Amino acid sequence: MQESRSIVVTIAVEPAPLRSVCPRMTDTSPASNARNYPLLAIPHIQLHGAVDDAMYDTFKTQLAAAPTDGPLVVSITTLGGDPEVARAMGDTIRLLREYTGRETLFLGKVAVYSAGATFMSAFPVDSRFLTRGSRIMVHERQMQSTIELNGPLNSLSNALEAKLHEIEDSIEIQEEGFRALVDGSKVALDDLRARAASAWYIEAEEARDLGLVLDII
């Protein structure tokens, strides 16, 4: 009786290259203009969360690690925080631009509220961008303070005057920030003051139309 034999043939098939089976992730729709601004794809400094001392430390660390020449791109997502920290980071950006002549670009993502808008004001309007669906919120500075009057009557007016001077100085700082925010835009300073009194939420498209930012990504 003849012995039957079976032959097993194994065929190795290489998978198709990944790029041929996976769709490209770049948005090429007519509504997308991301390709017009390739520098914004990966910001050198990426900030998110509350504007506070921790964010300032992150800002300084990322700035030190960033390239020392060419445009510097900074992105931020924040609901607000300490306006003085925002001003300090903004001054660093301004001094970098003035001393080195480097271009600095701002990219707001999702929310640029309160102190975030203060930081944005450190960038020229033609260097500001927002991602689609983002919003800016601008409001007046807030103060919570209790004045305790204790002592001879003739000395009490000094305490009141000191608090009044503090308020006046805070208003002047606010005015400086408002002027920087609208400088070069279509928004009048008086209009910003009026809207900021009740918190002004500005959608990305409106911000672009008003000239507060150059474009939307």
Q: What spans do the regions from the language model cover?
A:
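Terminal-region recognition feature
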Residues: 2-217
